[in-house]
Amino acid sequence: MRASGLPARKSLRWAAFLSYGGEDCAAQILKELKMDNDTTDRVKTLVRWFSEELQEDDCKVREVMSSMEDGRFDELLLLKESLLPEEAAGTGRIRKTAEAVRSRGDCIRMRDMAVTGKDLIAAGVRPGPDMGNILQRLFLYVLKHPECNEKEYLLNMAVKKDTEE
């Protein structure tokens, strides 16, 4: 375990220190130390995912990337490489997968989807919780099938499903 190889960023260093205690333990310790909320949130995310086995599959990488803020996935990989050198080869392959996801422009944020709430309203979907559910369902679909992130395709999918319910 070599945390000394990490960049001198407060959240990364704290995550390395607290990585084996779990997210709840890290949150409690940082709260008692009166750590700022941004650092606490960053550390909790890193600690939560540190113990998870990441998969090289494009879909799984997109799902993990979408669950955290921009840049946090790269910090997670740095943390894993520093603290788990025996997994460095796998982490390197996951990094290449993440780079491929980014270079292709795969959608990993709901805001990057080809369809917005305004598009759904224009297509006849009523605003409200149901529209949020439709957007969430479309987003999960796009995470698994990034090639389907096209406005017409997603609108047809949303309207079709909305009329079935």
Describe each region flagged by the PLM.
Residues 1-90, 165:
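Conserved, hydrophobic alpha-helical core segments of structured domains
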Residues 83-165:
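Charged substrate- and nucleic-acid-binding regions of tRNA-handling and nucleotidyl-transfer enzymes
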